[in-house]
Every structure is written in structure tokens, then in C-alpha cells.
From Swiss-Prot:
Name assigned to this protein: EPS I polysaccharide export inner membrane protein EpsE
Main localization, broad class: membrane
Keywords, comma-separated and alphabetical: Cell inner membrane, Cell membrane, Membrane, Polysaccharide transport, Sugar transport, Transmembrane, Transmembrane helix, Transport, Virulence
Transmembrane segments: 20-40, 49-69, 91-111, 133-153, 160-180, 185-205, 234-254, 261-281, 307-327, 341-361, 375-395, 396-416
Keyword Amino-acid biosynthesis on entry: no
Higher taxonomy: Bacteria, Pseudomonadati, Pseudomonadota, Betaproteobacteria, Burkholderiales
Intracellular or extracellular location(s): Cell inner membrane
Domain of life, source organism: Bacteria
Gene that this sequence comes from: epsE
Gene source species: Ralstonia solanacearum
UniProt function note: Probably involved in polymerization and/or export of exopolysaccharide EPS I which functions as a virulence factor. May play a role in export of EPS I or its intermediates across the membranes.
Length: 436
């Protein structure tokens, strides 16, 4: 039987083209989630929206730190591998590692949902939503990581197509279902959309890595390499999303915890809208920076400076705009019950502007292979974040406490990151050619 010719590898595109495609996809996906939360804030009661937000943020944060950690390691390793067969087996190793980590996290959340609900709300009122969130976690984490894998494999166009399609599907389902009255139903819709996107991404990656032995085979050496690079990266991201969830749990433990969570959640959507641009640029920039192994420091600096000026500058501009317009935004887009969330939005606007700079500095350090240094700085950030959140909550700042704590922690983190990069300014990026 005649064998089908393997699909040619996608041509490498410029960083500008990759940025345009990545940002377009991010605008579509984040925009859909953003609009969805506004719709749910109108259809759900404030209490139920608080339960939904806590459950969804739990799934998103626990899944996000695993997805970001593994995909950051993949974005560092895969662009350095020239052999297509070896690149395919290494990609499979990262996918296997991701599946194992997600399975453990989802099982832990599902089994402990009642305990978490009691700790957060004083009763099991949120346990059902948290159990659904454990299933949502699997799909959301997979979708986030597989998108970064597509970037590392130069499948930017396919990634953009899937993201835009998922965004359209999410809004269509919410419109077709009419007003949503139950948090579990809203979580089910998010689950269906993310699951469909994950399946589509797997099919694209399978086509992008053809092999005579099948698309999903790997080896012990590839798994060892995946664990070696993913471990410090996952530990670093564990200092972010799970720590943020801990701070939200402290907020939920207040007397009116569900109400405070609802106020914070509607404001936090604007934080995400501001920070997704530098986050997307960071995911796109890492493979490009890593691919310049052995390049002059001047070349790498120029590429990094372009991403920093655009992503960080835009975050600063959007942060200032949202800070000044917070009152008007909540008067225009949300029911009157959410008016007091404007103060939370102002504190989060400051944090978002700082985050836009920090995330790009983190990727610059990761591109140099210094994952453990990122972990050390992230650990310091986490301690400051939790301590500041606890202090602000004790002082009675309510939902505004999280934004204030994040701002303080990001200020310290940016200082440490800047000192780290200045200390290495005289050396070229050395990633080695052991992957070639």
C-alpha cells in the first residue's frame, strides 16, 4: 500500500506575524469570557455569581499553574530541537507529563470539594460547583497548555482559528440557552467549549508531527528531559495561581464572603483584560528568544525590548485608563449591586499595569534557562502577596485587599527581576546546543 507523504513542517513566521495572530486569538477568547461574565453577572444573583466565580477561578488557577509551568518548559526546549522525529517524541513527553499532573490536581479538587467549601463559606453550599470545577479544570488546563505547544511548533494560524472558533461557540451557547440561573449550568457550558477546543488542538498537533510509529509515542529519555525542565517551571507558577486562590479563600471566609467574591470577580475580569496582552506576548516571545541560542546579547536584547515596550507600555496605558474610568464602567455595564466594586477595580488596575511588565521580565529570564531563579523570586512574591492580603483583610479593606496586596507583591518582584537581568547584562544568552 502506498504511504502518504508526511505533512511538511510549517514555515517559521516572523515574530510580528506571530504576535498579530496570537493577540487576535487572545482578544477573541478573553473577550468572549469577559462578555460571558458580564452576562452571568446580570442573570445570576450576586450570591450565586460569587459561588460560580469561586468555582471557576479555582479550576482556572489550579489548572493554569500546571499548564503554564509545563508549556513554559516546552517553549524553552522544543524550538531548540531540529530533528522532527525527536521534536515529536519530546512534545509527546510534555503532553504525557501534563496529563498526569492535571489528573492528580482534578482528583484532589473533586475529593476535597466539601472540605474546601466548608473552609471558604462555612458550609457545603459551594461543594457542587467545586466538583464541577474539578472537571472544568481538566479542559481549561489542557486548552491553555496545548495553545502554547502550538506556538512552539509554529502552528500560530491553527491556534488562532481554534481560539476564535471557541469564542464564537461560547457566546452562541450562552445566547441560545437564555438567562443562566444556576452556577453549575454556567460551568457546564465553559466545560463543553474548552473540551472541544482541546480536542481540536490535539488533532492539529497530531497533523503537525507525523510519524511512522504513530503521533503519540515517546520515550524514557524524553520524559526525563520534560520533568527536568518542567519541575522548576511548575514550582515557579505554583507560587502564582494557587497562592492567588489561597488569598481568594481568605476573602471568601469573611462574613459576607460570597458577596465580596462577586465584587472582586467582576473587577478581576478587567484585570485579565489588561494583562492578557503581555501574557500572550510572553508565550509568543519565549520560543523566539530561546531559538536564538548563541546569538549576540544585542540581538536578544532588541527582540526583548520590542516586546517589553509594546506589551508593558500597553498594560500601563490600559491600567491608567481603567483606574480613572472605574466608576463609569460599573455604572454602564453592571447592575447597581456591583457599584462598590469600583474600588477593587482601581487597586487591580495598578496591579495589572505592574503585572504587564513583570510577566515579560519573567519570560526573558526563562528564555535564558534560569527557571530556578524565577522560582526563588516567585516564592518571595508569594510570601509578600499572602501576608499583604491577610493584613489588608484584617484592616477591613474587603474585596479591595487582593488588588492592594498584588500591587505590593509585583513592585517587589519587578525590583528583583530587574536586578537579576542587570547582573547578567554582560553575558550572552547561553542555552546550549545539546537539543540539536
Amino acid at each position: 500500500m502506498q504511504k502518504t507523504a508526511p505533512r511538511p513542517l510549517p514555515a517559521r513566521i516572523s515574530f510580528l506575524s506571530a504576535s498579530v495572530l496570537g493577540l487576535g486569538a487572545a482578544v477573541a477568547s478573553r473577550g468572549a469570557v469577559f462578555v460571558s461574565n458580564i452576562l452571568l453577572a446580570h442573570s445570576l444573583t450576586v450570591h450565586d455569581f460569587g459561588l460560580f466565580s469561586y468555582a471557576y477561578v479555582t479550576a482556572l488557577n489550579l489548572g493554569l499553574f500546571l499548564a503554564t509551568g509545563v508549556s513554559q518548559a516546552a517553549g524553552h526546549v522544543l524550538p531548540l530541537i531540529e530533528n522532527p522525529e525527536r521534536k515529536r517524541t519530546q512534545l509527546c513527553a510534555f503532553i504525557v507529563l501534563l496529563m498526569a499532573l492535571i489528573a492528580v490536581a482534578a482528583a484532589a479538587l473533586y475529593l476535597s470539594s466539601a472540605s474546601i467549601s466548608v473552609a471558604a463559606f462555612g458550609s457545603e453550599q459551594g461543594s457542587g460547583a467545586l466538583r464541577m470545577a474539578a472537571i472544568v479544570l481538566i479542559a481549561t488546563a489542557f486548552t491553555q497548555a496545548l495553545q502554547s505547544f502550538q506556538y512552539a511548533m509554529h502552528e500560530h494560524r491553527s491556534s488562532a482559528t481554534i481560539s476564535i472558533g471557541a469564542a464564537v461557540l461560547l457566546l452562541t451557547m450562552l445566547w441560545a440557552m437564555g438567562p443562566i440561573r444556576q452556577p453549575a449550568l454556567a460551568l457546564t457550558i465553559f466545560l463543553a467549549v474548552n473540551a472541544g477546543a482541546a480536542v481540536s488542538q490535539l488533532l492539529v498537533l497530531a497533523r503537525a508531527t507525523p510519524s511512522q510509529r504513530g503521533p503519540w509515542r515517546t520515550g524514557r529519555e524524553e520524559l526525563r528531559l520534560a520533568v527536568k525542565h518542567a519541575l522548576p517551571s511548575v514550582l515557579t507558577t505554583s507560587m502564582g495561581a494557587p497562592v492567588h486562590w489561597i488569598c481568594l479563600s481568605m476573602l471568601a471566609a469573611m462574613t459576607d464572603g460570597a458577596h465580596q467574591l462577586a465584587l472582586f470577580s467582576v473587577a478581576f475580569q478587567w484585570y485579565i483584560a489588561i494583562t492578557f496582552i503581555p501574557a500572550t506576548l510572553g508565550n509568543l516571545a519565549l520560543p523566539f528568544l530561546a531559538r536564538h541560542a548563541g546569538a549576540t546579547e544585542t540581538t536578544v536584547r532588541q527582540r526583548f525590548r520590542s516586546a517589553l515596550l509594546f506589551g508593558g507600555g500597553l498594560s500601563l496605558a490600559l491600567g491608567c485608563a481603567s483606574f480613572l474610568l472605574a466608576g463609569e464602567i460599573f455604572a454602564w455595564f453592571y447592575p447597581a449591586e456591583y457599584g462598590s466594586a469600583a474600588s477593587s477595580m482601581r487597586s487591580l488596575s495598578v496591579a495589572a499595569a505592574l503585572c504587564g511588565v513583570s510577566v515579560l521580565l519573567q519570560q526573558r529570564i526563562a528564555a535564558a534557562g534560569k527557571f530556578w531563579r524565577n522560582f526563588a523570586m516567585a516564592a518571595v512574591y508569594s510570601v509578600i502577596y499572602v501576608a499583604a492580603s491577610y493584613l489588608a483583610l484584617r484592616l477591613g479593606f474587603g474585596a479591595t485587599s487582593i488588588g492592594l496586596a498584588m500591587s505590593a507583591a509585583y513592585c517587589c518582584l519587578i525590583l528583583f527581576q530587574t536586578l537579576t537581568l542587570q547582573g547578567d547584562s554582560g553575558a550572552a544568552i547561553r542555552l546550549g546546543r545539546s537539543f540539536s
